[in-house]
Structure formats: C-alpha cells, structure tokens
Amino acid sequence: MMGCTLMGVTVVGMMASFPHVQERVKNWEDEVAHSQAVTDALLSIEGTKVLSDYPRRHSLTRVDTRGSFDTVAQEHKKRGYFLSSELKKRGITGIIPGSTRVWKYNTFGLTTKQIQHVGEAFVEVARENGLNII
C-alpha cells in the first residue's frame, strides 16, 4: 500500500472517507425518490426528455429540454439565460446560465420540501412561458 507514495496517499484518503460515505448513503432510497419526483415534474412539461436511465436509480439526472425550454429560449429576449434567471427568482441556483438544451441536475441532500419547490418551479416557469403541461 505504501510502496508508491501517490497511490498510498490516495488509498489512505479513501479509507478515511469511507465512514462518511457510508453515512451519506443510508437514506439512498429517499434520495432516489427525490430525484424521481423532480424528474416526473420535468417530464410533465411537453417536449422534455430524460437521457439518463428511467425510472431513476441515481440522484444525478441528465435531461434534454430542446423540445421545451429551448423552444422558449429561441424567442425570449434573454435567450438561453431566461431559464436560469427564472429559477434564480425562485431561489434555485446551480443551473449553468444559458443551458436550455441538454443539462444535468443533482438532487442529493435536498429535503422533501425543497424537492417539491424545485419541481413546482420548473412547471411554473413552463406554464408562464406557454409550454404545455401533460
């Protein structure tokens, strides 16, 4: 283990962090359910597709919104920045400004209340911009 300093330090670091990782994944089913809730809200917006496996088994999700938010961005005065701007007004940050085509989000560590807020915010933005909700 300590023959190569670079590899040894990496292994020791991983061993030291393992208890923290174990603690973080104790509620993995809840984390996946949270991801599924936001994914379902996004899928209720006509033209939105999930590019990750579905139903969700992970908290990181890749979505394609070229058929929904990107169509709004083409006509909107803020172009692709409208989505991040609208979400920021609602207290949601982290979406890369200008991203309305294909992007990722991660729901890990959010509370149920925060998950509901995020899902409702996406649907609200879609509704305000004339997108159909299925």
Describe the residue ranges of each PLM region.
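Active-site C-terminal subdomain of aminotransferase-like
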Residues: M1-G67
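Conserved C-terminal alpha-helix-loop-beta "cap" of PLP-dependent enzymes
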Residues: D40-I133
